């Protein structure tokens, strides 16, 4: 199933495609935490992806966090295929145009709502170029250094990019730190 089939769904529509479990989480929090089933596990039925949140004593807060983590998992683990001929038009996509600066750099932070859709597209392009960062950067209309900086911004994106490169027989990327 391609990511594009669910990315436009609101929370209620997405939850309708999921199985939601609540349970008692262990750990600190005292009597309230030990007596209430505040931890939430959401499993997307068709993809099998699972997201868990158990850090809050509020089931409602944990449900919101688990749903956000499920959306992140979709962007990280599900790829929308891009054919090699379609790579030339990727840099014109609306989700990239909204975050690209006049200098040609992605200006979007990890907490920005646009971050995960852009990260998903970047990983799609990286897969289409068989993990070649320079080719992916060219298709995205940014420099290789800016692409590396973007991937490094979120450890989960960095890890996924390296797993993708490994699948294509490429060496892992090294951090600039």
Sequence positions of predicted segments:
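Helix-turn-helix DNA-binding helix
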Residues: 147-148
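The alpha-helix within a helix-turn-helix
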Residues: 136-137
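Helix-turn-helix DNA-binding elements, focusing on the entry/boundary residues of the two helices
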Residues: 132-133
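C-terminal flanking helix
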Residues: 155-159
């Amino acid at each position: 199933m391609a990511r594009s089939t669910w990315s436009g769904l609101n929370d209620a529509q997405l939850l309708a495609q999921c199985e939601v479990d609540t349970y008692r989480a262990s750990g600190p929090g005292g009597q309230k935490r030990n007596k209430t089933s505040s931890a939430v596990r959401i499993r997307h039925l068709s993809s099998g992806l699972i997201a868990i949140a158990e850090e809050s004593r509020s089931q409602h807060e944990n449900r919101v966090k688990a749903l956000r983590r499920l959306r992140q998992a979709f962007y990280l683990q599900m790829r929308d295929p891009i054919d090699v001929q379609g790579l030339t038009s990727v840099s014109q996509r609306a989700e990239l145009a909204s975050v690209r600066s006049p200098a040609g750099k992605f200006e979007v932070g990890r907490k920005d709502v646009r971050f995960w859709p852009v990260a998903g597209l970047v990983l799609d392009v990286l897969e289409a170029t068989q993990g070649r960062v320079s080719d992916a950067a060219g298709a995205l209309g940014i420099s290789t250094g800016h692409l590396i900086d973007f991937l490094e911004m979120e450890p989960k994106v960095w890890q996924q990019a390296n797993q993708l490169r490994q699948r294509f027989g490429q060496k892992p990327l090294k951090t600039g730190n």
